């Protein structure tokens, strides 16, 4: 649909809004075959829930299904789609997301709605004075959307569980590959990083049919960076 074919210049000028995520520099995170969509965009979200509903209606009646396994993040939805070389903290500064944040929290950034420089200014404010509110809000929105998905797969006779796997992109340097990292840094890194990626572990207790699953790729390598980053151990 050409309505959603928007260039970075239009996004930066404020003359059009993208259905893709936008980073701190005002660039859309568009990947292979249009990946990089913003799950907070209504059109994108409706497409997700409609597809999930179709899957559930097709397979719900066969029984014996434990639940639905979904990967969140990197290029998969719902999540903050993160291209290689970037982290979740750098993603999510589009006009729609910022307007929703301001509306939900009552916090006003008081920045212009046009011009490329507004994205870097948003990043500075939301990772500075409004850090706690920003990342708490992102985790709440992710939780709300996850609950909506869970409701879809419980709408029939057979109630499926939802298993959510955050696929977050780690920075090149972190406490599990820095020789001077402290035990405290390693003990808190995973939880802090999940919060920044919109998956605050405190919002998931596994008792309501929604389970946050630890990231377990690269586990067989058992190197200090890989093993530590996926288990929050190594101290």
Regions found by a protein language model. Give the residues of each.
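Active-site-adjacent "subsite" loops/lids of carbohydrate-active enzymes
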Residues: 1-60, 112-135
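Acidic, His- and aromatic-enriched active-site or binding-groove loops in soluble protein domains
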Residues: 11-30, 90-109, 181-204
């Amino acid at each position: 649909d050409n309505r959603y074919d928007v260039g970075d210049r239009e996004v930066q000028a404020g003359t059009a809004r993208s259905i893709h995520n936008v980073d701190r520099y005002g660039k859309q995170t568009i990947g292979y075959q249009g990946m990089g969509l913003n799950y907070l965009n209504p059109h994108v979200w409706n497409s997700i829930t409609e597809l999930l509903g179709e899957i559930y209606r097709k397979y719900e009646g066969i029984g014996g299904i434990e639940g639905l396994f979904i990967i969140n993040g990197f290029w998969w939805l719902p999540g903050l789609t993160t291209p290689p070389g970037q982290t979740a903290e750098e993603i999510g500064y589009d006009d729609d997301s910022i307007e929703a944040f301001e509306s939900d929290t009552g916090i006003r950034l008081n920045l212009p709605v046009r011009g490329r420089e507004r994205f870097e200014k948003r990043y500075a404010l939301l990772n500075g004075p409004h850090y706690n509110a920003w990342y708490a809000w992102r985790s709440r929105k992710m939780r709300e959307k996850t609950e909506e998905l869970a409701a879809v797969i419980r709408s029939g006779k057979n109630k499926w569980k939802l298993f959510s796997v955050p696929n977050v992109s780690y920075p090149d340097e972190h406490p599990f590959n820095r020789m001077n990292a402290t035990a405290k840094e390693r003990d808190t890194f995973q939880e802090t990083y999940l919060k920044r990626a919109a998956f605050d572990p405190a919002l998931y207790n596994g008792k309501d049919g929604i389970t946050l699953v630890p990231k377990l790729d690269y586990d067989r390598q058992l190197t200090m960076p890989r093993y530590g980053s996926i288990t929050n151990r190594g101290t």
